[in-house]
Amino acid sequence: MDSLLHYVHASFSSLLTPFSFSLSQGPANYSQWARFSPLPVVVNKDLSEHIKTEDDSRYFSLIDVFDDNAGTLNEQLAKELLAKDFERNIGIDVSFHQNSGAAIYQQLGIAIAKTKELTELFGKEILNQLVFRIAIGANYFFEMSKVRALKLTFNQLSKEFGLDEIPYIFAETSLRNKAKNDEENNLIRSTLELAAAMIGGADAVFTNDYKLQNANELSEEISFKQQIVLAYES
């Protein structure tokens, strides 16, 4: 996800799962997708400084304030993001860990540990300002359960602070099980991963391009339309 903004489009299918496609530039009017309402997602901390929110715009930040390599929290960045007029201000990224080979229980543990540390630092009010970014692997039923388990564990944590919050989950297809020389297989795997995320109850889904090298407009369009096909098939 190298682009600065992603647009998430809400689908009123039976799964009620928004989905997204990648933009390399700023906001645009995609009238052909009239059935879907645009929901901008910020993934670049430098861009966030220049965004002017409007009454009809809802920005969701996927920017993680934790340095997973150093194991530290960037408190100043967190304060700057919380000062923004976003719908949700801070991302908790555990897709990095899935793509690095972490087990499901490790991914969930890291997500909850990050949440607890943020809550202790900024108070319980931060719980409804978080976006969980997760990657969905090939183990269909286990990945479906991972999404639901994250909802349950987060909700249980919020109850410890006297709240009853449900997490906002942004799920994307995994990169770990994709191959440069097997594009068709990548397409099949990512479709199953999307289905697992949607059935599991993710609030938004994103498809990484199935062509790991020499990606083009056609491959981007096909990757995006995977999500549309699943929404209508449901």
What are the language-model segments listed below?
Residues 106-107, 138-149, 176-188, 215-223:
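Short glycine/threonine-rich loop-to-helix capping motif typified by GTGT followed
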Residues 129, 158-161, 213, 234:
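Inter-helical turn/loop segments and adjacent helix faces that build the functional surface
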Residues 147-151, 195-198:
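Alpha-helical transition-metal enzyme core signature, strongest for iron centers
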Residues 123-126, 163-167, 194-204, 229-233:
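A glycine-rich, aromatic-flanked flexible loop/lid motif
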Residues 154, 200, 226:
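Conserved, mostly hydrophobic/aromatic
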Residues 192, 203-234:
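Active-site or pore-adjacent capping/gating segments
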Residues 1-140, 166, 204, 208, ...:
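Catalytic alpha/beta active-site cores
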Residues 116, 120, 135-136, 151, ...:
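Accessory "access/gating" subregions that flank catalytic or transport cores
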